[in-house]
């Protein structure tokens, strides 16, 4: 007779689980049992030798255990802390200009098309499908200035089961493409409408995020009002900072009375412990100290920083200042929608900084793996809910099969000594793609392969 279990058990897996903790950048748990409640939370993760005890406690039979093959493993879902959903329409192209020219020539004209909800429906459906298929279980999305289209993005992420923050972009300055901006009053009013309608929907895993595009596209009045909206509704804030040198000089010219770029956001109520700022390539020590004091986060977007020749973020310096940091794809300045690409680029950028003697060491693959999972969850304030396989967290996970059909990975005899080796895990992180991601879970629910309803 087994004990009454609360909450009821939905899934039990036996096999290898790979995740990060704050003391260990990559922990490989071989031959373990993991149980998921029907509410999607992890209720146990123990060695398989404890099966009999767990079966009595949680009332499951051996036939209910799903056993992974010796070459498969689970890892936490990937967290994309910065991605522009509308820019997916031209991802993989048009990365031939520096940031400000790139925005004016490619980005703003593309985003203006999203005044059509039909365009939004098509592109947003595709970007959510594509990112989920590639293992992004949590995404922090920029939409456009169009409220209704941004609401469609939220609806689509909820329908597919992706965990997300969704932001309606705000910009009341844009002299170069004047048709793509709002008045200050419109931007504030539409942000309030966006937030109100999002909160009324009460999506379980999709939340609104206040989204001033960046300092060059927002007046002080707008920034201050957006900061107040975020404070009133206790919301997260996302924007960009110190992406390239030309941008930083333009901010100095536009707002000469402020000490630096960070000070503009800080003085206008936009730098809080619920703020995530993309890039930060050129933040000074003084600015990093302010980030740390405020509890604000940085989204490291190495593909975009390289593709647009913007800069090289020194992640070790950010971590030294105790600033929270995760990884972002930054589609479409970053040409890849894959967080695996972000992992690889982050390692390479760190290697370049070592080569140039900026640092005395580099980031390891294991440390970057942690940034893409647990680090990203912390940057978005979700580390008590997701990011690894700790008991009590929701089961956001990827089932990885390095031997999947048409896999880009070749495995050899030496890759296996009994259970899966760390070499196989590394091969997936460096060589793998969506063909190796056989199943994706968000909150305990399998969302990939996609159901017929989506």
UniProtKB/Swiss-Prot annotation:
One of its GO terms (molecular function) is zinc ion binding. GO terms for biological process: allantoin metabolic process; amide catabolic process; deoxyguanosine catabolic process; dGMP catabolic process; GMP catabolic process; guanine catabolic process. Coiled coil: none annotated. InterPro entries: Amidohydro-rel, Guanine_deaminase, Metal-dep_hydrolase_composite, Metal_Hydrolase, Metallo-dep_hydrolases. Keywords: Hydrolase, Metal-binding, Phosphoprotein, Zinc. It catalyses: guanine + H2O + H(+) = xanthine + NH4(+). Its EC number is 3.5.4.3. Zn(2+) binds at residues 82, 84, 240, 330. Transmembrane segments: none annotated. The modification Phosphoserine is found at residue 453. It comes from the Eukaryota. Its cofactor is Zn(2+). The keyword Manganese does not apply. The keyword Hydrolase applies. Pathway: Purine metabolism; guanine degradation; xanthine from guanine: step 1/1. Binds 1 zinc ion per subunit. Substrate binds at residues 84-87, 213-214, 240-243, 330. Pfam families: Amidohydro_1. Homodimer. Belongs to the metallo-dependent hydrolases superfamily. ATZ/TRZ family. Catalyzes the hydrolytic deamination of guanine, producing xanthine and ammonia. This is Guanine deaminase. It comes from Mus musculus.
